Structures are given as C-alpha cells and as structure tokens.
Amino acid sequence: LNSKITPKDTLRLNMLTWFDSKEAEPQSQYYYGSGDSSKEDILRYINWNRTDDQDGWEIGGDWEHTFNSKHSFKFRSVLTKKNNDKKSISKENNGDYLNKNFYISSKESNDRSENERILRASFNTNFKNGGALEYGVESAYNKLERSFALLYLNPDGISQDSGLFNTKGKVEEDRYEGFVSYNFPLTNLIRSEIAMNYEWSEISQSGDVELSREFQYWKPRIDFKWDYRKNRQVRFSILRNVGQINFDDFISSFDQFEERIRAGNPDLKPSTAWEINLEHEWRLANDGGVITLTGFASQIDGPVERVPVGGYAAVGNLGTGEITQAKLDGSIRIGNVLPGGVLRFMGYLQSTEVLDPVTNIKRDLHFFRRWETMLDLRQDIPNSRYSWRVWYRSYSQTNIYDPYLWGRWAEEPMLGGSLSVKINSKLNLNFMFNRLLEKYGVGRKIVYNGFKSSNDILIQENFYVRNHGFIKIQLEGTF
C-alpha cells in the first residue's frame, strides 16, 4: 500500500506471510577407509531423513513528511515473526551396505522461534551546494527461543540421551544506534560521503544458562565516487563493520556434516573489522549491461570460529584474521546472438589467514572458499509467453577446522534452471529444477583423540555426500 495522505505526507505499508511444510531434504553419506582413494569398499553408510516446517509473517512500513524543499522526516518500522521446526533421523549401516541392513542411529529435534522489531527515525536536509545531511536513531529488539534434543540408538534399539548441557534457552538483544552522514560533491565528477554510527546493545540469555552482557561500538565510514567518464565510475570506501551474532551459537546443537556435538557458547561476542573496498564499474553503451571489478581487504578482530569449550567444540572468537579478495561480475545483453537473452557471470579469488588457537599455526579461515564461479543464461523469448533460465556454479574446496578435527570438503559443480509460462498479465507458471549433477560433494576427515595439536589420530575417513535433485512447480501471482 502506497498512499499520498496529504501533499506533504506519504504512507507505505506492506505485509508478507509464508509457510513451507514438511520440506524433505534426504541426504546420503558414504564413508571409506583413509587408504581407499578409489572408494571401492564402503565402511559406513548413513542416510539422513529430514522434515522442516516453517511459517512466519512480516509487517513493515514507513511514513515520510516533507517540511519544505530542503527538510524532510521519515519513520520506518518492521515487525517479524519466524517459526522453524526441524527433525532429523539418521539411518546407519555398518559394513553391510549390499544387504541394506540399516538401523536408526540417532534422532534429532530442533524447535526455534524468532522475533524482530526495528524502529528507525531520520531527518534529511538538502543544501544549495548539492550536499545532503541525514541523522537519526534506530532501535531494534531480537529474540530467539530454541530447544534442541539429540538421542542416540544402538543396533538393538536401546536409546541414550546425549547428555549435552545448554540445549534450551532464550536469547534476547536490545540494540540502539545513532547515526549521521553527510554526502557532498568535491568536484563536478567526484562525490564523497562521511558517516559515523554509534551502537549500544545488550544481549541476555536465559534458560539453562543465565547471562547478560553489553557492547558499544563506533562505526565510522568514508566513501568516494568518481565518474571519470560518462559510463565509468570508480568507488572507494573505508569503514568499520560490526558482525551480526548468530543467536543459535549461544545454544548447543549437533553438526550433521562433522557428526560432532557443537556446544553453545554464552561468552560469544560480535567480530569487528576494518574494511577497504575499491570498485570499477563499466556501463556498456545502449543499455547493453554492466561489468564491475572489485578489490576488497579486511582485518577482522575476533572472527567467529570453533574453539574448545568444556570438552566440546563450540563457536567462539579467535584473535585477528585477514581477508583479501578480487571479484569480477556483470550482466550483458546478448540480443545479437540470442534474441532477448541476458548473460550474467561472477567469479572471485580470495585469500584468508588466522592463527589457529590449538596448533598456534597460521591457516585459512574455517569453511572459506578460495574461489567461486557462476554463469547464468536467461532468455525472454520475443513475441511469446515463455522465458527460460539455466545456471551453473562451481566452487573450490574448503578446509574444516575444529579443536578436535580437521577436514576437507569439495562440492561438485551445481546445475539448475527454470521455465516460465505467462498465463496472463497477473499469473505465471514456473517449472524449476536444481542439482541435476549426481554428487553433492566429497571430503576427508581426521578425528583426533584429544586436541589436534597432540597429533594422536583416532579416525581417518574419506566420504562423499549426495543430495537429491528436485523439480518444483510454482504458480506465481500479482494482484
């Protein structure tokens, strides 16, 4: 809803609701001995069956009042509610793969509910020199209520609780932020923006653990934009960023990929980073597309990774980490080759570094890819109701770091696409498909008897994980 209430007042409202019931995500894991590089003898086979119920709603809006040509006021609000109920059952087979002699080895349930409320008020002032000043305040409240349970079963069906502590709780955050920014021209071709934000927040946890902490951060930012040609622009920025804490990390859970309990860490704090970003944007003639080259560097204080907590691996903060990245992405119209066609592409190379808290050796960041590529081809067939899309994405391998484990994970390339039929001006029928390639990924895992710094190897395994492909039919309407 977008309504001009008075000549000086505009009101915008929106509402969204969703539900996604019993979304099955079957997955198979095959394990081999460390010396079985050809993957001929299966030691273990685990089949995961999952259900995932989701529902929620969001209500948002803003009111804008114009005092005169130079001054205006805007108030925004967002209210969100999300519910998620996940259940997983693992069926295991030990050395009898051909006979399919499976037994249920574990049952896991994860019930969570999220609430969010954001209120933001800002004033804007325009100046004769082309500058603009914005200042205001923002208030946010976030809440997570979560309950996790893990039950182990042996081949005889005898169950045993995992006995894990801190599996139920409520995490709440109250956050307040004041901000001011000034955007102004330096020359006819160069604009700059300087900004300063101050953030204060309190995070409290109740349930199995009772804890409350406060955080305060200054977040400066400076931007430059240079239109050195009509269709080319250079952008440069320096800023301090504060990471967003994942509230799930405060409460214990189970990592299905690593088959390890992940303890909750009530002492977790947000990471902070100084970031430098340099971009060059080239807009092709005749609205032919855009190509962007980006260089990025960041120094992170307290990156969030796995640390030892109470005999388990938990999510916690490390020392100082670094990230550097070069990225190329763009979108080009290819009507001369494919009428109505658009080709999108993306690729990046990056390097990361942090000091491992257990081995005291520098390494890359946990689960960070060194490179990624993407190709996306779409065609709106001229003079017809049809459009189609095919996309391809590939990744480098990633390393898995844990106080008690080291692993390597490499995903197979992913292929997907869609076909859309325009029924009328308001309705579309979409056919979507994904994961057409057979395997999902391959990996290697080394589990240590104690900290990995002792080099006392307990288990070495090779494995691959297979996710099933899917086909989805969707009716989409606009009213």
Named regions from a protein language model:
Residues V242, F345, S396, V421-F479:
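C-terminal beta-signal and adjacent terminal beta-strands/loops
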Residues K4-D20, R50-G207, L211, Y217, ...:
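Face-selective signature of the C-terminal outer-membrane beta-barrel domain
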Residues L1-W48:
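Periplasmic-side early beta-strands and strand-to-turn transitions of outer-membrane beta-barrels
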Residues A24-I42, K86-G95, K100, R146-N154, ...:
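Outer-membrane beta-barrel translocator domains and adjoining extracellular loop/strand segments
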Residues I59-G61, L119-A121, G178-V180, P220-I222, ...:
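Membrane-embedded beta-strands of outer-membrane beta-barrel proteins
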Residues T167-V171, R213, V242-T292, A297-Q299, ...:
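Outer-membrane beta-barrel signature, preferentially recognizing the C-terminal barrel domain
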Residues T294-Q299, N317-T398:
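Gram-negative outer-membrane beta-barrel transporters
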